[in-house]
Amino acid sequence: MARNEIRPIVKLRSTAGTGYTYVTRKNRRNDPDRLMLKKYDPVVRRHVDFREER
C-alpha cells in the first residue's frame, strides 16, 4: 500500500464557526470514522472541538 492510502492528510475545522483549520494525518485503520479532536482556536481564544472535513 502507498503511504498516502494508509495515512491521508485531513483538515480539521473548528466547530466554533470561526473557519480556523488544522491540517494533520490520520490512520484509517485505527480511525475509520471522522476525527474529532479538542484543540486551541486562537480566534475565540479557547479550546474547542475540531472535526474532520471531507
Swiss-Prot record:
Keywords: Ribonucleoprotein, Ribosomal protein
GO molecular-function terms, A-Z: structural constituent of ribosome
UniProt cross-references to SUPFAM superfamilies, sorted A to Z: Zn-binding ribosomal proteins
GO cellular component, one term: cytosolic large ribosomal subunit
Coiled coil location: none
InterPro entries referenced in this protein's UniProt entry, alphabetically: Ribosomal_bL33, Ribosomal_bL33_sf, Ribosomal_zn-bd
NCBIfam families: PRK00595.1, rpmG_bact
PANTHER family tied to this protein: 54S RIBOSOMAL PROTEIN L39, MITOCHONDRIAL (PTHR15238), LARGE RIBOSOMAL SUBUNIT PROTEIN BL33M (PTHR15238:SF1)
Name recorded for this polypeptide: Large ribosomal subunit protein bL33B
Gene assigned in the entry: rpmG2
